[in-house]
């Protein structure tokens, strides 16, 4: 699959029995968009790993170095806005509304933005590495899987990376409701949770992907 839409389309059409690419906040946004559609009655069968999202720049070495009016290029997904904004807030570049749920926060929830940074969530995720390589914008937010595919190092190349601790964005095995109890699905989740697979993930990705 070349985007984040087709895996759920295939699951809804029963072309596949499960998919493994999305986190709970993204799944919730999909379920909201397809409310009442029985083909989209999906649930998580288990969380497997986290791919910490990174912010990349060829022009600046930290978020605090970004210029006034700096353009931040982001993926076109509402479910990612709070995730990304939390990184900027943690670095002291912006502030969100007090008490807001960071998972569901939106760009409109920014209450302090001294640098007047311009967040532009309108780019398909697979195009973000190319925009970074073309030196577009002042910073580009790239999901780890696309960064890896583009030959980037998601641990050392970004100027800021989200923490893997208490991270709600773990990738999950998604199935139709009720299928999470099927023997084959339970076996799949158990294999992915096994020490052998978790050790392989740690060795292969060296921190770019974190097993849960």
Give, region by region, the residue ranges found by the protein language model.
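Short helix-initiation/N-cap motifs at beta->coil->alpha
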Residues: 1-9, 100-130
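A conserved helix-loop-strand patch within extracytoplasmic ligand-binding domains
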Residues: 41-94, 198
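Extracytoplasmic/secreted proteins, especially bacterial periplasmic and envelope-associated proteins
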Residues: 6, 10, 15, 25, ...
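Extracytoplasmic
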Residues: 13, 21, 39-40, 48-52, ...
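Ligand-binding clefts/hinges and TM-proximal coupling segments of bilobed small-molecule sensing domains
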Residues: 75-104, 189-212
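Periplasmic-binding protein-like
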Residues: 44-57, 148-192, 211-212
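Acidic, polar ligand-binding/catalytic clefts
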Residues: 17-52, 60-62
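Beta->alpha turn/N-cap motifs
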Residues: 3-4, 14, 18-31, 123-125, ...
């Amino acid at each position: 699959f070349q985007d984040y839409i087709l895996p759920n389309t295939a699951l809804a059409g029963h072309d596949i029995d499960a998919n493994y690419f999305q986190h709970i906040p993204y799944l919730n946004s999909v379920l909201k968009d397809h409310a009442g559609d029985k083909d989209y009655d999906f649930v998580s069968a288990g969380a497997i790993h986290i791919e910490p999202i990174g912010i990349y720049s060829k022009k600046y070495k930290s978020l605090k170095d970004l210029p006034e009016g700096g353009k931040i290029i982001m993926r076109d997904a509402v479910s990612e806005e709070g995730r990304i904004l939390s990184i900027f807030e943690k670095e002291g570049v912006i502030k969100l509304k007090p008490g807001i749920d960071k998972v569901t926060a939106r760009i409109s929830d920014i209450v302090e933005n001294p640098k007047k940074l311009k967040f532009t969530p309108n780019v398909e995720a697979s195009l973000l590495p190319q925009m970074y390589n073309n030196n577009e914008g002042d910073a580009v937010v790239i999901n780890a899987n696309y960064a890896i595919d583009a030959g980037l190092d998601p641990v050392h190349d970004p100027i800021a990376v989200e923490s893997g601790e208490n991270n709600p964005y773990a990738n999950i095995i998604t199935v139709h409701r009720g299928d999470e109890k099927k023997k084959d699905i339970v076996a799949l989740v158990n294999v992915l949770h096994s020490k052998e697979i978790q050790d392989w993930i740690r060795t292969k990705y060296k921190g770019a992907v974190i097993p849960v």
